[in-house]
Curated annotation (Swiss-Prot):
Keywords, comma-separated and alphabetical: ATP-binding, Glutamine amidotransferase, GMP biosynthesis, Ligase, Nucleotide-binding, Purine biosynthesis
Gene (name only): guaA
Domain (Glutamine amidotransferase type-1): residue spans on this chain: 5-195
Residues annotated as domain GMPS ATP-PPase: 196-385
UniProt KW ATP-binding keyword: yes
Catalytic activity: XMP + L-glutamine + ATP + H2O = GMP + L-glutamate + AMP + diphosphate + 2 H(+)
Function, as annotated: Catalyzes the synthesis of GMP from XMP.
Enzyme class of the recorded protein, top EC level: ligase
One GO term describing the cellular component: cytosol
Active site, renumbered: 82 (nucleophile), 169, 171
Organism whose genome encodes this protein: Finegoldia magna (strain ATCC 29328 / DSM 20472 / WAL 2508) (Peptostreptococcus magnus)
MF term (GO), any: GMP synthase activity
UniProt-listed Pfam families: GATase (PF00117), GMP_synt_C (PF00958), NAD_synthase (PF02540)
Stated name of the protein: GMP synthase [glutamine-hydrolyzing]
Pathway: Purine metabolism; GMP biosynthesis; GMP from XMP (L-Gln route): step 1/1
Length: 510
């Protein structure tokens, strides 16, 4: 089934993937395309709508991202956001100027003229601004449909050409009626049918996997995390016993996790293999402290283990991975800069002894993966399991990985997760874990001086893992956690709580 498509044209802004997420939440499929490739892709795929994203540049800067004007003649509805609005305004004869002061944060937008894209919206509503340039004179043929106290041209519309633009960011939660505006664009202007659902995706992926694999064998790296678990369930539904799930116990798992994974997946519907590779991994990681190098080593050793298991199993043509959309984005695909190498993307060795990779989840955001898991009738405790990176505790141990650090971290992390669950806030926090730093500090226990590790606690709330806010855990929960860790875990004498959002920080420390 060919879905209706919206193309999100990427000009390099920080919220570009979030826009895609918002569109999909409204049951319309979309793809993100770099601006340099936009015209060719749009001509080829014939989307029902186009969205221009924000970006860090000024439209008048030399080498700033531009768009072929032919796109405006294709009779496809367009919505510009932030930089996208400035670009549309410039190309249609409006005036864009540098603001005296950057406008960043919440402001009140007032409707000045009615428009189809504002249907059902309040006369005044809170919007989120983040710009240094602004449109001082509207382009020819456009009406000003919203204003703010500091931005007289906050939104514009050309109803005849079906081109609309807003200076603010409707995709972020801070813009109170942003979802309504995007929905109006999709359904009132682009006439979307809303045919993007997990039920449809599941049916299509099963057929696609069967067509790709045929009667050949697939080897899946199963970590027990949400992504690989849903991937396993999907592949099992599609190809049954032609799937072998290999769980590599690399010695970098959380407390009791290896046994829990085996209990969950060792059944008659899957070929399940557990490999105890702890010594193999720790020997490779000995003396290594650079986080990128650790990720690469862990990623490569995973593949080597899979190759060894494949030889035991027999002819294996495909390696399957639970790669999801944020993994691809963070690993610097397209025009994005590399933030960190993801174990499912950047950590792959150049030579892999498999015919091909299968990544059936690579177009899905985390929340879509969970919805797919529920569609597959997976138990909720698996679908809502705490996210856990492929490199495991290897990237939650700062500096060199040692057995002592791993054991300390396992116990401390278990206590933190236990206290969060006891407080009944585990469903309110999207990810929470402990990190053992490479710093030792002076402390006092009883009458004795100590010189032990500092432990960090990290907890975030997020809807898509592309952006995240630090979780406001009650002080009493943090206090209970701290007291238990200090009393029950050796070699920890100081505990800190990470109050950094993403961006600027990533969720993991390494």
């Amino acid at each position: 089934m060919k879905h209706q498509l919206v193309i999100v044209v990427d000009f390099g802004g920080q919220y570009n993937q979030l826009i895609a997420r918002r569109v999909r939440d409204l049951n319309v499929y979309c793809e993100v395309v770099p601006y340099k490739k936009a015209l060719d892709v749009i001509k080829e795929k014939q989307p029902i709508g186009i969205i221009f994203t924000g970006g860090p540049n000024s439209v008048y800067e030399e080498n700033s991202p531009q768009i072929e004007k032919e796109i405006f003649e294709l009779n496809i509805p367009i919505l510009g956001m932030c930089y996208g609005m400035q670009l549309i305004s410039k190309d249609f004869g409006g005036v864009v100027e540098k603001a005296k002061n950057r406008e960043f944060g919440k402001t009140n937008a007032k409707i000045s003229n009615q428009s189809s894209i504002l249907k059902g919206m309040s006369d005044e509503s809170i919007v989120w601004m983040s710009h240094t340039d602004f449109v001082s004179e509207k382009p020819e043929g456009f009406d000003i449909i919203q204003t703010t106290d500091s931005c007289p041209v906050a939104a514009i519309a050309n109803e005849d050409k079906k081109i609309f633009a807003v200076q603010y960011h409707p995709e972020v939660n801070h813009t109170v009626e942003g979802k309504t505006l995007i929905k109006n664009f999709l359904y009132e202007i682009c006439k979307a049918d809303g045919d993007w659902t997990m039920e449809n995706f599941l049916e299509e992926q099963i057929q696609k996997i069967r067509k790709t694999v045929g009667d050949k064998k697939v080897l899946l790296a199963l970590s027990g995390g949400v992504d690989s678990s849903v991937c396993a369930a999907l592949l099992s539904r599609a190809i049954g016993k032609n799937l072998t799930c290999v769980f590599v116990d690399h010695g970098l798992m959380r407390k009791n996790e290896g046994d829990e994974v085996e209990a969950a997946f060792k059944n008659d519907e899957l070929n399940f293999v557990r490999v105890n590779a702890k010594d193999r991994f720790l020997n490779k990681l000995k003396g290594v402290s650079d986080p990128e190098q650790k990720r690469k080593i862990i990623g490569e050793e995973f593949i080597r283990v899979f190759e060894d298991e494949a030889k035991k199993i027999g002819s294996v043509d495909f390696l399957a991975q639970g790669t999801i959309y944020p993994d691809v984005i963070e690993s610097g695909q397209g025009d994005a800069s590399v933030i960190k190498s993801h174990h499912n993307v950047g950590g792959l060795p150049d030579v892999v002894d498999f015919k091909d990779l299968i990544e059936p989840l690579r177009d899905l955001f985390k929340d879509e993966v969970r919805r797919l898991g529920l569609e597959l009738e997976m138990p909720e405790y698996l679908v809502y399991r705490q996210p856990f990176p492929g490199p495991g505790l290897g990237i939650r141990v700062m500096g060199e990985i040692t057995e002592e650090k791993l054991e300390v971290l396992r116990e401390a992390d278990f206590i933190f997760r236990d206290e969060v669950a006891k407080a009944g806030i585990d469903k309110d926090i999207n990810q929470y874990f402990a990190v053992i730093t490479n710093n030792r500090t002076v402390g006092v226990m009883g009458d004795f001086r100590t010189y032990d590790y500092t432990l960090a606690l990290r907890a975030v709330t997020t809807t898509d893992f592309m952006t995240a806010d630090w979780a406001r855990i009650p002080y009493e929960v943090l206090d209970k956690t701290s007291v238990r860790i200090i009393n029950e875990v050796d070699h920890i004498n100081r505990i800190v709580y990470d109050i950094t959002s993403k961006p600027p920080a990533t969720i993991e420390w390494e």
